[in-house]
């Protein structure tokens, strides 16, 4: 492979890394398939596969949340956690308005409280190991996360006992850690 091809591949990998670090969902979607179609070295392809898995899991989970919101009916209520229910007041592809404690609360997708985001995703995906991995990756990279939530997400990944359909859980953890140590 020429230096030019390798440099272009490196730029694509850098763009993918930056999209993940910024939780830029649109950019992640755009770059994911382009990344795997890009000609690159074996080492670069290995990195591309790792980044693709992170993007795939995160987008899968975020899509579960947005699909769940799209299926909610105005006026319906549901349990977020034990003894905590919300009523759906309004919804759009970008936000959800729920009522609890006699107040309306408006959230964009990225601002949803974790308990609410995870409950919405559960409406769409079963509690299998793939969805646990997706939940972990989403919580790790989402804009409103913090170090404690990242540690919790890594713990969920470590607790996965079965195969992830070709996705190596150790690779997920090491890729996430390397991406976010680069960022800091």
Regions inferred by a protein language model and the residue ranges of each:
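Compositionally biased alpha-helical segments
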Residues: 1-184
